[in-house]
């Protein structure tokens, strides 16, 4: 994102998703000092004496510069500072066809608006003090959320709960810094620093930081999810497992080996974790060129998945083909599903002892899915109890908080070494700077560019 783009420009963009499956409504958004003038140039209210009032919808028509009508629409003006960007904002609510929405946007540009860059509306909201940086990042997280838990976590961030926690820590550190600096400036007028009490407050701040850091791993998991590939030799029930797990008939199931020749994908949520579930072609040697391509693709996919689910047939037991597949993936996070246990018991099969996660199943009947989901959660969380998150740190925020922690550890070492108070202030300021990077009070243009460039246009 180009942060040198003039903030005085009035910007415009399509604010709703542009997808092949057209929605019923499409919104074009304007922000800037000329937003209202541009809207008035291309939108005529149906009622002749209608007055543009802030936060009131107007019904009318969008037209081109020659007065030719383009769409029947609604318009709403949000007068600064009572808008998302704290600038004048106008939204034009059109019918959802892409041609209509694009034509409306083009009229805005012809009247002098500049096409907004990705994230520029949210950047202006941040620069104008409407939101802090944690809230801006939560906007992107809310748009990208793939599970109810991720959406709730992003919403809490958007409401400012993470920013409030960070600012509270900052205020406490500022209080500690003020006590030291007062004694540096007015040493003769103040009693000596109560070091044990001061240190206890510092330890409390460190504990609060650690509690926030504990949310980062789970938060990242809820945001990004995991890719799970179902692998195994042909006809062991991989497609039946995908269908049972996803609750949909996504894959063709037959008694013929080699039916699945391409990767079949399904999206689901497992205990709050977004999962991209992939059913792959059965891995075996084959003379069929089409099936061989599917096998090769399955092998490549197995190397990129976060978790592999290896399916075997309880009737056949642990075969040489199973052992060969396992040998190629044994270094990866793995769950073994022993399928068709209604036909043969799983406990009679001799399996490699190092496979920790084993799930008996009858995929065709949907049996074993809860146990499989429990194994997946245990595997990706490494068995650690997972907090019920209200807010969580993303990777950037966690890195900054670790930097703040490291600075406070330097303060502790300075205290233990009985260094002068001046040395304490250096690292306290370092911790304050790191916390300011989280909320955006102290942030570089390069970091802002990195953050807002991942937004979609119109946000």
UniProtKB/Swiss-Prot annotation:
One of its GO terms (molecular function) is GTPase activity. It is found in: Cytoplasm. Its cofactor is K(+). InterPro entries: G_TrmE, GTP-bd, GTP-bd_TrmE_N, GTPase_MnmE, MnmE_dom2, MnmE_helical, P-loop_NTPase, Small_GTP-bd. (6S)-5-formyl-5,6,7,8-tetrahydrofolate binds at residues 29, 91, 130, 459. GTP binds at residues 235-240, 254-260, 279-282. Mg(2+) binds at residues 239, 260. It comes from the Bacteria. One of its GO terms (cellular component) is cytosol. One of its GO terms (biological process) is tRNA wobble uridine modification. Residues 225-381 form the TrmE-type G domain. Binds 1 potassium ion per subunit. The keyword Cytoplasm applies. K(+) binds at residues 235, 254, 256, 259. Pfam families: MMR_HSR1, MnmE_helical, TrmE_N. Its EC number is 3.6.-.-. Keywords: Cytoplasm, GTP-binding, Hydrolase, Magnesium, Metal-binding, Nucleotide-binding, Potassium, tRNA processing. Exhibits a very high intrinsic GTPase hydrolysis rate. Involved in the addition of a carboxymethylaminomethyl (cmnm) group at the wobble position (U34) of certain tRNAs, forming tRNA-cmnm(5)s(2)U34. NCBIfam families: mnmE_trmE_thdF, PRK05291.1-3, small_GTP. Belongs to the TRAFAC class TrmE-Era-EngA-EngB-Septin-like GTPase superfamily. TrmE GTPase family. Homodimer. Heterotetramer of two MnmE and two MnmG subunits. This is tRNA modification GTPase MnmE.
């Amino acid at each position: 994102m180009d942060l040198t783009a003039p903030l005085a420009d009035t910007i415009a963009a399509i604010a709703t998703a542009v997808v092949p499956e057209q929605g019923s409504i499409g919104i074009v958004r304007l922000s800037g000092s000329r937003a209202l003038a541009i809207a008035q140039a291309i939108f005529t209210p149906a009622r002749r004496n209608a007055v543009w009032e802030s936060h009131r919808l107007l019904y009318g028509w969008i037209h081109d510069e020659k007065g030719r009508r383009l769409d029947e629409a609604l318009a709403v003006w949000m007068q600064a500072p009572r808008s998302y960007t704290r600038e004048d904002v106008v939204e034009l609510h059109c019918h959802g066809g892409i041609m209509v929405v694009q034509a409306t946007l083009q009229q805005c540009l012809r009247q002098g608006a500049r096409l907004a860059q990705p994230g520029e509306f949210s950047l202006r909201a941040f620069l104008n003090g409407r939101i802090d940086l944690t809230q801006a990042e939560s906007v992107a997280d809310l748009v990208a959320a793939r599970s109810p838990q991720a959406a709730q976590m992003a919403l809490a961030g958007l409401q400012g709960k993470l920013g409030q926690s960070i600012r509270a820590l900052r205020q406490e550190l500022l209080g500690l810094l003020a006590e030291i600096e007062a004694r540096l400036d007015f040493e003769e007028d103040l009693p000596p620093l109560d070091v044990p009490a001061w240190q206890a407050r510092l330890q409390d701040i460190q504990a609060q930081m650690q509690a926030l850091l504990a949310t980062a791993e789970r938060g990242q998991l809820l945001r990004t999810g995991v890719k799970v590939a179902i692998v195994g030799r042909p006809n062991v029930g991989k497609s039946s497992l995908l269908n049972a797990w996803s609750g949909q008939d996504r894959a063709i199931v037959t008694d013929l080996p080699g039916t699945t020749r391409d990767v079949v994908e399904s999206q689901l949520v497992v205990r709050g974790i977004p999962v991209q579930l992939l059913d792959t072609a059965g891995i075996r040697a084959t003379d069929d060129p089409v099936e061989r391509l599917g096998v090769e693709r399955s092998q490549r996919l197995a190397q990129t998945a976060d978790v592999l689910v290896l399916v075997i047939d309880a009737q056949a037991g642990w075969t040489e083909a199973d052992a060969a597949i396992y040998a190629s993936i044994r270094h990866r996070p793995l769950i073994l599903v022993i399928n068709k246990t209604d036909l043969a018991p799983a406990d009679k099969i001799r399996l490699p002892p190092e496979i920790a996660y084993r799930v008996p199943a009858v995929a065709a009947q949907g049996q074993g899915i809860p146990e499989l989901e429990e194994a997946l959660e245990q595997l990706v969380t490494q068995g650690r109890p997972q907090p019920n998150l209200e807010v969580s740190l993303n990777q950037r925020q966690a890195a900054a908080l670790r930097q703040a922690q490291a600075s406070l550890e330097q303060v502790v070492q300075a205290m233990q070494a009985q260094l002068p108070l001046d040395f304490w202030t250096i690292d306290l300021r370092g911790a304050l700077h790191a916390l300011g990077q989280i909320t955006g009070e102290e942030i570089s243009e390069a970091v802002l560019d990195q953050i807002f460039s991942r937004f979609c246009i119109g946000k």
